Amino acid sequence: MSRRGTTEEKTAKSDPIYRNRLVNMLVNRILKHGKKSLAYQIIYRAVKKIQQKTETNPLSVLRQAIHGVTPDIAVKARRVGGSTHQVPIEIGSTQGKALAIRWLLWASRKRPGRNMAFKLSSELVDAAKGSGDAIRKKEETHRMAEANRAFAHFR
């Protein structure tokens, strides 16, 4: 048994302009090769494009998109007696948001388009409306969990 104490859970910091934790989480996920200023640039351009497209508060669109993509349940591979089962597990809110952000960025990178800011803004607007690849990914995950409901007792 470890004598070391448990670590305190780190809370996500908020970004300098919008004072929003979700924006900062997005920036940290979009970050590549330590280029944080470029990541901020991409996010802020995407937010401006959302403002132009929807003519509503872009942060509410972002919140709505992340809320729409956040999964409640996922499947985890579990090996039981020589065979691997996909076991459905519930997901906490923090992990769900992290997954949602990862899926949104994956879907926006896959999109055809000019630049990342344009693709990200389009994906966020679509996700807020309830369509797009990220929403499809969430629904697919929920379907997988529902199909493997029989293995829920393997948790």
UniProtKB/Swiss-Prot annotation:
Part of the 30S ribosomal subunit. Keywords: Chloroplast, Plastid, Ribonucleoprotein, Ribosomal protein, RNA-binding, rRNA-binding. This is Small ribosomal subunit protein uS7cz/uS7cy. One of its GO terms (molecular function) is structural constituent of ribosome. SUPFAM superfamilies: Ribosomal protein S7 (SSF47973). One of the primary rRNA binding proteins, it binds directly to 16S rRNA where it nucleates assembly of the head domain of the 30S subunit. GO terms for biological process: translation. InterPro entries: Ribosomal_uS7 (IPR000235), Ribosomal_uS7_bac/org-type (IPR005717), Ribosomal_uS7_CS (IPR020606), Ribosomal_uS7_dom (IPR023798), Ribosomal_uS7_dom_sf (IPR036823). Belongs to the universal ribosomal protein uS7 family. One of its GO terms (cellular component) is small ribosomal subunit. PROSITE patterns: RIBOSOMAL_S7. It is found in: Plastid, Chloroplast. It holds the Pfam family Ribosomal_S7. Disulfide bonds: none annotated. It comes from the Eukaryota.
